[in-house]
Every structure is written in C-alpha cells, then in structure tokens.
UniProtKB/Swiss-Prot annotation:
Gene3D superfamilies for the chain: Cyclophilin-like (2.40.100.10), Zinc/RING finger domain, C3HC4 (zinc finger) (3.30.40.10)
Keywords on record: Isomerase, Nucleus, Rotamase, Transferase, Ubl conjugation pathway
Family in the record: Belongs to the cyclophilin-type PPIase family. PPIL2 subfamily.
GO molecular function ontology, one term from the record: ubiquitin protein ligase activity
Pathway: Protein modification; protein ubiquitination
Protein name: Peptidyl-prolyl cis-trans isomerase-like 2
C-alpha cells in the first residue's frame, strides 16, 4: 500500500507492506518483479526446440522434447548432444511423432490444417495436455484426457489408432500446462544459455544466402546493403571458423603498404592478437573454478585471490570426457600358454573400458591370470585374479558404467567385451566371443577385437575340454599383456605437435607476419625498417640486377666467378685477352618491362 495521508514520516503499515514502499522490498520492487516474470518464456507446443520455428517433420526425445528432424539431424552431425539439456543424444534415440490434422493433407502443403486429437478431433492448443504413445521408433499423439478416459481407466492398453499394445511407461508427455518442464522453458535451454543462436532451418539458410532485399530499387543504398550483408557473412564465417577478431584479421591481411607507419600498425595488430590468444581458455580447463577466491575471502590463512581461474583437469579426466572422440586405434598382444593374440582397441566409443584395460595391463594385473570359463561356440571369459568369476576390480577400485554408444556389435568371432553382473558393473573381467552373439548387444561394452591369432590361438582355446561348470580342464593362462600402441598417448602426442605448430605460427605472426604478408604485389620483400630489398643499392650491394623476381644475375655471376677462379688464373697467363665491343643500346618505347621501377 502507498501513502494514505500526507504525513512527514512513514507509518508502520507502510514499512511492513510488500509494495514499492516496503522497507524489505525497496523502491524498484515493481521493476524486479517485472524482470522475474519476463525471464520465463514458454515454447509453443508446435515449435521445434532447436530452431524455435514451427516444425514440419516432428520427432521427439524419450523425455518429450520436440524437434524438427532436419534441424536436429544437422545439429547431431556436429555435436552429438541434446541442444536443450546438453546430454548425449544420437539419431537412433529420436522417436517419430504422428500428429493428426483436421485439414486435407493430400494437398502439396503438408502442414495444412490444425493439429488435433485423432479420436475426439479436438484442436491442440498451448493449454492442452498432450502425450505420445511410443511403439518402438514411432509414437502416436493424443490428448491426455483421451488416453486417460479410454485406455487407463478401462485398462484397455491398446493404441486407439493402430491397435498396438503399450504400457504406462510408453506414454511420453509432450506438453503439460500444469507442469512446464525445462523442455518447454526457453530460459533453461542449454544452447541458449551458452550464447548460441537458434539453429536455422533450410528455408532460413536459403533466404539468408539469397537475400530478400530488392537491391535495384534501392539505387546507391543497395550497394551499401550488399556490402553490409557481405561483411556480416564474413564475420559469421570467421566466428564459426575460430572466433577470431574479424576487424583485426581483415586489417592485418589487407595492409600491404610499404611505409614504416603501416608496418608499426601491423606489429601492433599482431601483438593484440597474441594477447588475445594468450588469454585463450586451456583445452583441459574444467567448467568450475579452483575455489581459491571464495576460500581466500573466508580464511585468513590463505593469500587473497580475485582471479577466479578455472580448475585444470588431469590427463585422465581430460581424455575420458564424453565430448572427446579419440579415433586412434590401440594394439595389445596377449601372451598365453597356447599362443599369442593381438587385440585392436576401440577407444572411440568405449574410452573408459579401453583406459581401464590398458592401465591394468600396464601394471601387470592380468599376468598369470587364468581363463575361468569357456563355452564352445559361445565365448571364453577371464580377467579375474581369484579365478572364481566373482572377483576382479577396475583401475579406479570400483565398478564403472557401461558404454553402449556407437556402431560396435557382437557380429563376428573374436569380439572382446567387458563381463558384468548387471547394469554398470564393469570391473576387470572380459570375454572373447567364439561366434557372433547379437543377443549380447547393448548389454556388454565392446572395447576391442582380435585381429591376429583367431585361427590358431583362439581355436586352440575353444578346443580345450571343460568340466560341468564350463571350467577348462587344462589351464589357459595369460602370461603377459604387452602394450604395442597406447591410443591415448598417441593422441596426446599429436595434440602437442599441433599445439607446437600453432605456437610456431603465432611466433611468426608476432615477428611481423608470414612470407606473404611481407611481400608486395610486385614480388619485392619488405624489410623490418619499411624499405624494400634492392632499393637504394648498387651493383656492389645486396640488390644487384635481377631477371624478374626469381633469378639474381649478380649472384649467378658471383657463383660462376668463385668456382672458376683457379682456371681463369691459369688461362690468363697463356691466352691473350680481348675487349668485347660496346653494343649500342636499342631504343625502347613505352615503359618496358617495369624492371627499373
């Protein structure tokens, strides 16, 4: 409440009120409340969560986030994550949505008509509770009240459209007006929080490329519009390529003047770019800080810190990040008492399993460990030091999660996978298949395959007789694991070489640019003081006569003189010398070949 009377003091009721004059609220309470309300914005149900435009061919994730199939497809080709939540996402996780429309869909316009419930024919709005009933890779869309009244309450668990059976867990909520989840709240979208723009649809990309401005009708202004559009496209391309400062980059590339002031300007630009690159975020930086700033402000025993620098991940944490794709193949030779097996490691889609196997092999964990289980025409299992099948521990001392993402399947002989006793219970045990076993797909993590020794060693293992509990009667023992190529070490080596090459290029730019930056269009090089080579120098200097910009006549003559000095001295004593007659210079018209400029 405001002031009721014209008093020279604030009453008790005014102090305790919750409006703009309350002591606990402040004079700008209304503005703050308005900002809080403006921060929330709901995505319409018929809009793609990635492009923020109406969808044409809708698909959804298992949690109910709707995308257009073309837009999310282009996103997954680059990022492999859900743009809304940031969690890993692949194309096979998407579910096609079948919406019903009340218009004639046989026309060329596929989106003609409103989206409706296929049973009650009610039009969907932003206030309709919408669900989808999943059947494998597709789902039919209904209103919740229809499913509740005709399926759940009568316990008739068959789809009302195609009569397919479903369960309660197959019901996916697409929109609930009473519970607006993060999948519909624009302020919670991760790619928008990260500062990225909405993904363009194909129509928007074509419109942006072609343009919609009538340049001819604008006259001179049209040329300015074209130049502005080209500048925006260059800036966008440079930002996508590496985030460089477009103005500085353009200035550094187009500066070709030979005076000293221009060279000083280029040097300052190179220094500015080097400062920006020095502040570049490290590759192994975490998403959280070291915490020294908060700790130094709360503890007198620490030195005050105000930088808020990011924490650095260890090599193991950095290499095993889900966003990494280490495509280098690794190789390990398994020495057994029946012969060697050469394994090819696959760290691209199972980095943790490969890391665990390599580190255990490196410290000799598998040395003298026997294979405790062998089933003919199926597989052989080992990796348990106790030999019981119930032991074993990972390199981290605890079980680690499964890694099923990727195209690897148990479709051949010699596939090496992690043995487990349930979901996310991988330790040190592994098995090698004797035959294809497709029923093990997405149940056991595949991390390697046998590339040498299948016909000899693996066949000998399979032929060993077993007892009633599938334990080999004659022991099959791993003598040693020899690491031939460590894919993580190779990847780090390539990364360091790449960083060294980038540092060398930055050093060249810091010293004045590349060779092309210090050469004029006539082919003459510019010195550090701003003068050109060959300028102000006679025959005795370093800039003798040249043929074009490639052949230095003076250098050729000097080399020929040096190599034949002894011969000439001997010949001069015996052969008379004669003077070559002076040739008349032919008159030339015009500018000639510009070699005197």
């Amino acid at each position: 409440m405001g002031k009721g009377t014209d008093k020279l003091y604030i009453t008790h009721s005014e102090w305790s009120s919750s409006d703009a004059y309350g002591a606990s609220t402040g004079a700008n309470a209304g503005a703050r409340a308005q900002r809080r309300g403006a921060s929330f914005k709901k995505l319409p149900f018929n809009f793609c969560a990635a492009s923020l435009q109406p969808f044409k061919n809708p698909v959804c994730t298992p949690d109910g986030t709707i995308f257009d199939v073309e837009v999310i497809g282009s996103w997954l080709e680059k990022h492999k994550t859900n743009p809304v939540t940031g969690e890993p996402l692949s194309a096979k996780d998407l579910i096609k949505l079948n919406f019903a429309r009340n218009g004639d869909t046989t026309d060329s316009d596929e989106n003609k008509g409103d989206l409706i419930d296929p049973v009650t024919f009610k039009v969907f709005t932003d206030n309709t509770h919408i669900v989808a009933i999943r059947h494998g890779s597709y789902a039919n869309v209904f209103a919740w009240e229809t499913v509740e009244r005709m399926n759940i309450k009568p316990k008739m668990w068959r789809d009302l459209v195609d009569d397919e059976e479903f369960g309660r867990r197959d019901i996916i909520t697409l929109q609930d007006p009473q519970n607006v989840s993060a999948s519909r709240d624009l302020s919670q979208f991760k790619y928008l929080q990260d500062g990225q723009d909405a993904i363009l649809t194909k129509e928007q990309e074509e419109e942006r490329k072609g343009g919609t401005v009538n340049i001819e009708a604008l006259g001179r202004v049209g040329e300015k519009v074209l130049r502005a559009k080209e500048a925006v496209e260059r800036a966008r391309a440079a930002r996508q390529a590496g985030g460089a400062d477009v103005n500085r980059l353009t200035q550094a590339l187009t500066t070709t003047s030979t005076n000293s002031a221009t060279n000083n300007n280029k040097t300052a630009i190179a220094r500015g770019q080097s400062l920006i690159q020095e502040r570049k975020r490290p590759a192994n930086a975490a998403t959280y800080t070291t915490g020294l700033t908060a700790a130094s402000f709360t503890s007198t025993g620490l030195t005050p810190s105000t930088s808020g620098s990011l924490a650095l991940l260890s090599d193991e944490q950095y290499l095993l990040k889900p966003s990494h794709r280490i495509k280098n193949k690794g190789y390990v030779r398994m020495e057994t008492n029946l012969g060697p097996l050469t394994l090819e490691l696959l760290p691209e889609f199972a980095p943790k399993a490969v890391w665990n196997f390599l580190r255990l092999s490196e410290k000799g964990y598998y040395r003298d460990v026997a294979f405790h289980r062998s089933i003919r025409n199926f597989m052989i299992q080992g990796g348990d030091p106790s030999g019981t099948g119930r032991g074993g521990s990972s390199i981290w001392g605890k079980n680690f999660e499964d890694e099923f993402e990727g195209p690897n399947t148990h479709s051949a002989r010699g596939i090496v996978s992690m043995a487990n006793k349930g979901k996310n219970t991988n330790s040190s045990q592994f098995f090698i298949t004797y035959r294809p076993a497709s029923h093990l797909d997405r149940k056991h993590t595949i991390f390697a395959k046998v590339i040498e020794g299948q016909d000899t060693t693996l066949t000998a293992m399979e032929n060993v007789a077993t007892d009633g509990s599938d334990r080999p009667l004659n022991k099959i023992v791993i003598k040693d694991m020899i690491i031939l190529i460590d894919p993580f070490a190779e990847w780090m080596k390539e990364k360091k070489q790449k960083e060294g090459e980038e540092e060398r290029k930055r050093e060249v730019a810091r010293q004045g640019g590349t060779e092309d930056d210090r050469t004029t269009w006539t082919g003459k090089r510019i010195r550090a003081d701003g003068t050109m080579e060959g300028q102000g120098m006679g025959e005795g200097g370093g800039g003798g006569p040249k043929v074009g910009k490639y052949l230095d006549v003076g250098a050729v003559k000097k080399a020929a003189t040096t190599t034949t000095t002894t011969t000439r001295k001997a010949e001069e004593e015996e052969v008379d010398t004669w003077e070559e007659p002076v040739r008349k210079k032919a008159k030339m018209g015009g500018f000639g070949n510009f070699d005197g400029w």
